[in-house]
Design a protein with these regions (language model features):
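Nucleotide and nucleotide-moiety/phosphate-recognizing core
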Residues: 2-102, 112, 116, 120-126, ...
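Hydrophobic alpha-helical segments within soluble ligand-binding/sensing domains
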Residues: 107-110
């Protein structure tokens, strides 16, 4: 079984914020699907091309994501290399996507929490660049909404994320996948 977890913060006030890119990609992939609730997470189990896949959106705050991910991993007996965590990344430019396995937290507290509770960083991270506005407080920036121009770039990322998620499900993802969207041609 594969686990695909999108990180974000629960609640209407956080919808469409930079920190909720993980939720946005999960929602886009699934479309309008009713998710069940367990272990403080919204989840749905699907069979995609014969592969069992668990989609998860933790309903704790980002910094406590590991407390939600770990019970699902234990309950469903999921190997860490079968986990994909979708998250925002301040250190990547807006529109850059990077997928890496066995990577550190890079300062992301949600990933730190997951590494701590799993006792391993041997999982895939699907990092979506949101840039970093050094002129703004980091917390205010990541909890801020995307501008219309930024959303155009993010829409490209979201549109292509399905193929990257499918590649993970089918065991065809390359650990160093790196793509750019929204660049001037």
């Amino acid at each position: 079984m594969k686990l695909i977890c999108g990180l974000g913060n629960p609640g209407k006030e956080y919808e469409h914020t930079r920190h909720n890119v993980g939720f946005m990609l999960i929602d886009s992939y699934l479309g309008v699907e009713k998710m069940s609730e367990k272990f403080n997470g919204l989840f749905i189990q699907k069979i995609i091309d014969g592969e069992k896949v668990l989609f998860l959106k933790p309903q704790s705050y980002m910094n406590l994501s590991g407390n939600v991910v770990r019970p699902f991993v234990d309950y469903y007996k999921i190997d860490t290399e079968d986990i994909l965590i979708i998250r925002d990344d301040l250190d990547l430019p807006l529109g850059r996507v990077r997928i890496k396995r066995d990577s550190s937290s890079g300062g992301d507290n949600g990933i730190k929490s997951i590494i701590s509770t799993l006792g391993s960083q041997n999982f895939y991270q699907f990092k979506v660049g949101i840039s970093n506005d050094k002129n703004r407080d980091t917390k205010d920036y990541v909890l801020g909404k995307f501008s219309k121009e930024e959303m155009k770039i993010l829409d490209e990322v979201i549109g292509d994320s399905r193929s990257l998620i499918d590649a993970f499900i089918h065991g065809q993802i390359v650990s160093t996948t790196d793509r750019n969207y929204g660049e001037k041609k």
